[in-house]
Amino acid sequence: MQRTKKITAFVLAIALCVGMLPTLGVNAKAADTGKHMDVLFTHDTHSHLNSFSTIVDGKQEEVGGFARLKTLIDEQKEKNPDPLYLDGGDFSMGTLIQTVYETEAAELRMLGYLGCDVTTWGNHEFDYRSSGLANMLNTAKASGENVPSLVVCNVDWSAMEKAGLTEGQQQIKDAFENYGVKDYVVVQKGDVKIAVFGVFGKDSLDCAPTCELLFEDPIEASKKTVEEIKKNEDVDMIACVSHSGTVEDEDKSEDEILAKNVPDIDLIISGHTHTQLDKPIQHGDTYIVSCGEYGRNLGTISMTQKDDGRWNVDTYELIPVTDEIKADAATQERIDELMETVDTNYLSHFGYTKDQILAENDIEFSSVDDMYNEHEELNLGDIMSDAYVYAVENSEYYDGDPVDVA
């Protein structure tokens, strides 16, 4: 009799555990809502509309380029015709395309041409000061083209208006209203509704010395925005396009801090630090993803909604944008037209053209990546510094004082 009781109790215990499996998160894929979401992402493209030459594993390769990105995006759309495409900011500054930033808004318009749904700004969007950002936004709007929604939730307009808006702040405020910049937007993709908000990080602000705007704390502003979304919107997913970034030290990793403090965010597209994450960082039910800089990779993540409303990652891939990918002809034609504008509106004033070779040498220079990764003296940095010294010493305003580049 005692043995029978023990067996019965054991069977009941197993039955209870099996019944709890979905609650414990075991086999969560089997207990989903049937909703699926494919997300494409980029960040820190820095005006790299054209492909560029770089060193990969000791070999020179041609990588990146929006025309190749377009090919990859179209291939992804063959699998799912309506993916969500998010961008994490710093879409400008880094090539000659930046010289027509205000007059052509080339970067933002080309993101729209690729099908980007939502982006945010990064610190480099302020490089041409308040008037530059305002002019660029107004130009993009006036183009009449399909441009991405622009979101950022932590601009502190109340504090600025209380102190009295400066001319630059007023310019940006007017441009925001004209373009339609918001704290967040709601995007419908198939049967999935996604709220996407943007946030501008602390280090990004430190890296934007020409920025005149005041900002709320990114975490507190994100908390308020997520609560507003939960209160006012019936959405399946909350995503954040963040220009804050991740670093190795988790205690200083801004987007990891964001994920821990605002756990209702499902997905964070993390820009600013040029990080390439070969697998998502996960904190609770929040996933952080990054694909590296300059359009070297197209980030892809496929997710399925669980029965508790949160999301599982099914697949995650960073697709390298290499010269093996055929460039989309129509996209390249648009880029070539923009480069002609660079020739006409900028380089011609100095007697140069975009394809002109200025110098040749037999020395193998260190790469730009080396300068990012190795904070020490490098021959590329040396020649750049020497060029600045030469330019100053040969300018009409040079007063004879010694020139030093620190």
Regions found by a protein language model. Give the residues of each.
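Sec-dependent signal peptide cleavage junction
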Residues: 20-33
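Acidic, metal/ion-coordinating pockets
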Residues: 31-324
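Hydrophobic core
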Residues: 12, 16-20
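Solvent-exposed loop/linker segments at secondary-structure transitions
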Residues: 46-50, 92-99, 111-114, 230, ...
